[in-house]
Amino acid sequence: MKKYGCLVCGYVYDPAKGDPDHGIAPGTAFEDLPADWVCPLCGVSKDEFEPL
């Protein structure tokens, strides 16, 4: 699974780690994140991420 980076703040979403602080389990692909998921650092939507 690919990592995705936030274009605004540089946060990297790593599917192997997920985002447990926001209810996203490890092993969750970026494409499978809920539509309302936002960057945990700066709050932008998934549209502001690109594959690394």
Curated annotation (Swiss-Prot):
One of its GO terms (biological process) is alkane catabolic process. Binds 1 Fe(3+) ion per subunit. The modification N-formylmethionine is found at M1. PROSITE patterns: RUBREDOXIN (PS00202), RUBREDOXIN_LIKE (PS50903). Pfam families: Rubredoxin (PF00301). Observed in four forms, with and without iron, and with and without formylation at Met-1. One of its GO terms (molecular function) is iron ion binding. InterPro entries: Rubredoxin, Rubredoxin-like_dom, Rubredoxin_dom, Rubredoxin_ET, Rubredoxin_Fe_BS. Rubredoxin is a small nonheme, iron protein lacking acid-labile sulfide. Its single Fe, chelated to 4 Cys, functions as an electron acceptor and may also stabilize the conformation of the molecule. This is Rubredoxin. It comes from Heliobacterium mobile.
